[in-house]
Amino acid sequence: MKANRLATALASLLLCSAPAFAATPPSSSASASSASTGSDSAPTESLTERLMKPLSSVTTGTVTVEGKAISYKAVAGTLVIDGTGAKESTPEVAMSYFAYFKQGVDPSKRPITFIYNGGPGSSTVWLHMGAWGPKRVVTNDDTHTPAAPYQLVNNDYSLLDASDVVFIDMPGTGFGRLLPQGKDDAARAADRKELIKKIWGVDGDAHAFSRFITQFLSKYNRWNSPKYLFGESYGTTRSAVLAGILEEQDNIDLNGVILLSQILNFGTSIDGPQGDPGNDLPYVLALPTYSATAWYHHKLPKYDGEKLGQLLKDSVEFA
């Protein structure tokens, strides 16, 4: 059912390994329709000069989800994010995105979900090409994916039947760039250092995302759409900060926030607890999840059948 797509899709998350994206994949069934830069660009313009204008390329395609074909418009582009205060009219960063819009529906009633990976320092290629986009990279299982060639296939688990999706790359990743200003190389290098200090931090990162989202909503006239955030790993930390900024400073009431592989407290992460000797919380908190995983794979005969609830209770008490 469409109402359950965001929730049920979580259980079907496809795991992808980094080498799967090391080479250029084969072309998909999407067909190019137009490309624009926001204004004519002279051939002599530098990359930085071009990125100071919003860029976009539009294609169309079809994805099949749960047996139903969904026609969509895809936009690959950048938005230019200006500074604040005295620099509110000065470009600071170009953030890249890939947006997919279902065609033939009223966009004002259509949910829109802003999706991003974490790192911090990662683009959103993983959730885009491995989980929720209309196409996905084929992986045989959840182990290391062999070398090229790789194949793109229809993604049966795409969220496009339930929501339009926008995959956002954090500043400095994907096709985005920091945009240092200055009359010469030394001035630009100094400004770049200031931008790094400002943007590559918890608050600066979240503020950049908030300005991206508000600009995106205006550009595509989606202010009346139900709005969701979907963050993975460090992206869940970003969501916690970003949701507050959107509500308190931008007057945007979100309809929901989805946290995947949450890392709101790094002190309780089971990924590398040996780096914090004496802190046993990661082991204590992970035991119920490990127990449930073992139960799913039928490794605990005592709890086979409908005994998951009892297993979790016993795991919590033991932990």
Name each region found by the language model.
Residues 33-45, 86-194:
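N-terminal cap/lid subdomain of alpha/beta-hydrolase-fold enzymes
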Residues 134-138, 243, 247-319:
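A catalytic-pocket lid/entrance helix-loop region that shapes and gates access to the active site
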